């Protein structure tokens, strides 16, 4: 019994030492910004930010008045939603590909229930596609990247 305890103790010490040792300074990441760091990412919005950056539905409840500087996509999602999780990396890729041309936002429907209710969100993921001068369109489901690119190129 003492032998087993000794072996387990030795194993625990080796494991702890190895885990704490780190990578010995290899593969250190530079603090200098790279081109990749300068690209856009999907931006999470709360209600106040949505009212400023997208649409102030409190001031203009009957008329759509887009507040953005470029076309946008708003992803209504939930952290527990499988299709939402599958869509997120696609939106991240698109935010980098269309950096400076299209803004991509996300809204957690569990945290921002008032926003979800204002747009009648009943199914997630739901995407709000917002061109500069036309009325927005809503699409539901985790669309593949090629369909989203087509929607961006044709509608936005």
For every predicted segment, state its role:
Residues 45-71:
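A short beta-strand-turn-helix
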Residues 73-74, 104, 127:
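Hydrophobic beta-strand anchors of alpha/beta hydrolase catalytic cores
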Residues 79-86, 126:
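C-type cytochrome heme c attachment motif
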Residues 123, 128-156:
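Non-catalytic, surface beta->alpha helical segment in thiol-disulfide oxidoreductase systems
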Residues 1-51:
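N-terminal targeting signals for export/organelle localization
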Residues 85-97:
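Typically the conserved alpha-helix immediately C-terminal to a functionally engaged Cys/Sec
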Residues 94-97, 102-121, 149:
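Structural microenvironment flanking redox-active thiols in thiol-disulfide oxidoreductases
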Residues 69-72, 76-80, 123:
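Short pre-active-site segment immediately N-terminal to redox-active cysteine/selenocysteine motifs
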